[in-house]
């Protein structure tokens, strides 16, 4: 009933102790800031798209250039995130914490920019991936349970972006066990 599906990652149960509880609020605040960065990028890229006007080739080339630059420096920003979230589950310890955190923040800002410049797709999977990457990076820095960090960061990032808490809980039940 609540298994993974539709390309969504499925995480194991988190271990919650005193360390995790101490980090709950800071992690939620960081995830919320990630969601706010999404909106900063959305408003900025809307203004840019409006300034460019009805020139779809210019918009597509600018979006492609942004994606190419980000993808060269941070390869996990290249795709929507369904598959990359599963890869991060297995490999996050081999990636520096700063790279994971930066990837999460850049992905959150890159997604609305690409959409506003005419690229197709939605924000749902990229926002989940932003929270996952951010959470794994913060787990490395804090020593807290990785699944706990991922759950808090993903929930707070999605909550900030979607602004529909019941929907966020419902969607995240497909990724995280009760």
What is each PLM-predicted segment?
Residues 1-178:
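Alpha-helical transmembrane segments and immediately membrane-proximal extracytoplasmic
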């Amino acid at each position: 009933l609540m298994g993974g599906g539709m390309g969504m990652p499925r995480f194991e149960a988190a271990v919650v102790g005193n360390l995790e509880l101490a980090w709950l609020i800071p992690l939620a605040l960081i995830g919320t800031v990630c969601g706010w960065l999404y909106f900063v990028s959305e408003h900025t890229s809307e203004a840019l798209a409006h300034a460019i006007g009805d020139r779809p080739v210019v918009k597509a080339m600018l979006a492609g250039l942004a994606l190419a630059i980000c993808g060269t420096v941070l390869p996990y920003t290249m795709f929507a995130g369904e598959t990359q979230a599963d890869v991060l589950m297995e490999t996050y310890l081999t990636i520096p914490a700063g790279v994971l955190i930066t990837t999460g923040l850049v992905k959150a800002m890159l997604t609305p920019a690409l959409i506003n410049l005419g690229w197709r797709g939605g924000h749902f999977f990229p926002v989940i991936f932003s929270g996952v990457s951010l959470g794994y990076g913060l787990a490395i820095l804090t020593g807290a349970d990785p699944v706990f960090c991922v759950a808090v960061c993903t929930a707070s990032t999605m909550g900030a972006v979607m602004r529909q808490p019941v929907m966020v809980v419902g969607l995240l039940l497909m990724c995280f066990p009760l």
